[in-house]
């Protein structure tokens, strides 16, 4: 399977990799979509996403759900994992993290459609949920609910 030409340009999958220090340093990788032209949905869930508050340097935590309808390319999952974990030492507000991740994946993969849902855990007593999508859901695309309940605290 590794001999398949669509995998030959990958530099991270199956290799020892160093954790990127920042999102700017992280390199997403992509492979050809063997079902290009077929409308379907792929979901990635990152329940332990971490970044830093740009003002206080305190950690912020989120549950991210990334739904995308692939176009000609698929995002390679190890590179996505490394990209997402590169935010651990990155200072940015919740909105910046969530929207920039969605836009980068959408542009890089030339996706047909993408939605990212960022469910940020409370800090200072306020949960912040951030949602971005590239446009209207394509007709005929099955998009299940994210399955993430609204934050209820102890209530």
From Swiss-Prot:
InterPro entries in UniProt: GTP-CH-I_C/QueF (IPR043133), NADPH_dep_7-cyano-7-deazaG_red (IPR050084), QueF (IPR029500), QueF_type1 (IPR016856)
Compartments, record wording: Cytoplasm
Residues annotated as transmembrane: none
Annotated source species: Hyphomonas neptunium (strain ATCC 15444)
Main subcellular localisation: cytoplasm
Name of the protein described by the UniProt record: NADPH-dependent 7-cyano-7-deazaguanine reductase
One GO cellular component term noted in the UniProt record for this chain: cytoplasm
Pfam families registered for this protein in UniProt: QueF (PF14489)
Binding positions for substrate per the UniProt entry: 75-77, 94-95
Keywords (A to Z) from UniProt: Cytoplasm, NADP, Oxidoreductase, Queuosine biosynthesis
Family to which the UniProt record says this protein belongs: Belongs to the GTP cyclohydrolase I family. QueF type 1 subfamily.
Keyword Cytoplasm: yes
Enzymatic reactions: 7-aminomethyl-7-carbaguanine + 2 NADP(+) = 7-cyano-7-deazaguanine + 2 NADPH + 3 H(+)
Active site: 53, 60
Function: Catalyzes the NADPH-dependent reduction of 7-cyano-7-deazaguanine (preQ0) to 7-aminomethyl-7-deazaguanine (preQ1).
A single GO molecular function term of this UniProt record: preQ1 synthase activity
PANTHER family: NADPH-DEPENDENT 7-CYANO-7-DEAZAGUANINE REDUCTASE (PTHR34354:SF1)
EC number: 1.7.1.13
GO BP: queuosine biosynthetic process; tRNA modification
The protein's annotated pathway: tRNA modification; tRNA-queuosine biosynthesis
